[in-house]
């Protein structure tokens, strides 16, 4: 487990307009499985089967070693990890130009600031590390000829698989909460024909709601009232371009100012 002293005091999660509305109305976090992510390397570990190696190397000459390719079981491992590990992601950066553009839909969404102490009560917060393009992906020998998800060693490896990403993702400065999909903290919600994994957000865990630069005043008021139902001490902010540098800044906004701006814009 990540050393708690090294975890920043605040963690952030970016949302699109529909995503933040749903999150605040239901007061829930969405959990993902590796197979649902947009990164093809998600949990795509190079695991090799000891029994398969023994079987294939018998009688092989060095020039025939090309036939050992079948010992790696990447896709099978990726699917298997989805059975033992679900995760939800956070960032340590609330002023990322890229994440505000992408995850917050060009500043029309919002970013939630979470209290790390409330988040860490799950006891499974881990830091993501990033590999350089030329780095070899780690190889993991399986303890058995088949994938046994109940093995403690395998579950430990599954968490390692989920916390290593390519260097292109470095800008996310990511931490992940990782839990088994069948954890008592996680529930299921039907959306259309599919089921998604969710968990309740502890009361008071949301310490600030940061509005995107392009969020209308009326929407700010609506989101502010939603979040205060379960997080009455939540503060508010608005992200904006710095006047002199190529960076974003977060300006604090009192709730009274949000409501006053709304009444002025409606007159």
Predicted regions and their residues:
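Partner-binding and oligomerization surfaces adjacent to conserved cores of proteins
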Residues: 1-267
